[in-house]
């Protein structure tokens, strides 16, 4: 089940999707018609299964076919995983930013931070540590950069 929140600013729609995308989700019904430009905020997507992937590709492929320009922002690990596994998962949309996992070296708190795709290229996909809000120690990126950002590296983003 998902929840969708829509907002319009300067002619660009923002659509925030939260929850699990699976066989029970009808993206056309949940999201509805799209304007000419849309930013899809993915941060709160918690899971996507194989039938959810099919629904996603069907929906965004149709949007691309109708000349709708769309971007994806705050892509969380479940979406990043699909972007890495399925070449056309973005259906021609541009990934603006990625939500990345960090783990504190001291207290082992799991954190997420958002990084712009263009900034990742500037640092060669190597993220500096961030400060843990719980204990102030260093939190390190908790994955292999070449694997987690493979879809961006392939695109040259």
Predicted regions and their residues:
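Cys/His-clustered metal-coordination modules, chiefly Zn-binding fingers
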Residues: 84-157
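Amphipathic alpha-helical interaction surfaces in cytosolic regulatory modules
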Residues: 12-95
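Short beta-strand/loop segment at the start of cytosolic alpha/beta domains
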Residues: 1-14
């Amino acid at each position: 089940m998902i929840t969708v929140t829509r907002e319009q600013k300067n002619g660009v729609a923002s659509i925030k999707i939260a929850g699990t995308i699976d066989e029970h989700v009808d993206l056309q019904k949940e999201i509805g018609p799209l304007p000419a430009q849309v930013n899809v905020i993915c941060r709160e997507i918690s899971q996507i299964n194989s039938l959810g992937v099919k629904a996603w590709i069907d929906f965004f492929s149709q949007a691309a076919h109708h000349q709708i320009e769309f971007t994806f922002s705050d892509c969380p690990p479940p979406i990043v995983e699909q972007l890495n596994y399925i070449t056309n998962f973005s259906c021609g949309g541009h990934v603006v930013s990625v939500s990345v996992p960090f783990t504190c070296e001291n207290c082992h708190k799991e954190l997420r931070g958002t990084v712009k795709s263009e900034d990742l290229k500037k640092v060669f996909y190597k993220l500096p540590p961030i400060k843990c809000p719980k204990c102030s120690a260093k939190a390190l990126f908790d994955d292999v950069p070449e694997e987690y950002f493979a879809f961006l590296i392939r695109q040259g983003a």
